[in-house]
């Protein structure tokens, strides 16, 4: 599933609780809104594959006024330990159309191939494998783990409005790398 959180006029004026109805979804909503320097934008991508006991969630936030980003990818499963890649303070002087950034131990890009139809997400990073889920909320110490994503999200359904933007059902295909494990993914998101 793809989620794009687009602040409404009410959120800009009154905080995060919308007081106006959700606006219609436009193709431009899938892309950064460069003309609005005060926006904090978010993109989320998720998937679940019962076949591989693997779910994933990627979240990228960009604050145009501070030129900082926040990034997290989590890989989980019923019989898997949590793998976490997180950087809460990424300096991004100029956000590219590919939503790409590099920081210490991480490179990621989020390419909108066709608005509201097709996204490509790439990640090469070092994350950590956590011993317990609670470690994700604490010091996030764990075993250093190589993580890679080369995934495509393709539209199954039309996007649906939400209180904070929109979401959309997609098919998700590609590769997930966790250290030496290579997972050929064909999932829903």
Question: What are the residue ranges of the model-derived segments?
Answer:
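Targeting-peptide/extracellular-domain and disordered-appendage signature
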Residues: 1-189
């Amino acid at each position: 599933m793809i989620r794009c959180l687009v602040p409404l006029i009410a959120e800009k004026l009154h905080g995060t609780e919308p007081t106006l109805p959700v606006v219609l979804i436009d193709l431009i909503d899938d892309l950064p809104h460069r003309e609005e320097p005060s926006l904090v934008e978010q993109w989320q991508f998720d998937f679940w594959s019962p076949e591989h006991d693997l779910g994933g969630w990627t979240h990228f936030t960009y604050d145009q006024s501070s030129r900082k980003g926040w990034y997290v990818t989590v890989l989980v499963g019923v019989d898997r330990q949590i793998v976490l890649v997180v950087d809460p303070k990424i300096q991004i002087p100029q956000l590219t159309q590919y939503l790409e950034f590099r920081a210490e131990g991480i490179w990621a890009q989020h390419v909108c191939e066709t608005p509201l139809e097709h996204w490509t997400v790439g990640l090469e990073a070092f994350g950590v494998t956590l011993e317990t889920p609670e470690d994700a909320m604490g010091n996030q110490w764990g075993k250093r783990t190589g993580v890679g994503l080369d995934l495509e999200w393709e539209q199954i359904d039309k996007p649906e409005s939400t209180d904070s933007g929109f979401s959309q059902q997609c098919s998700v295909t590609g590769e997930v790398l966790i250290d030496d494990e290579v997972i050929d993914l064909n999932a829903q998101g």
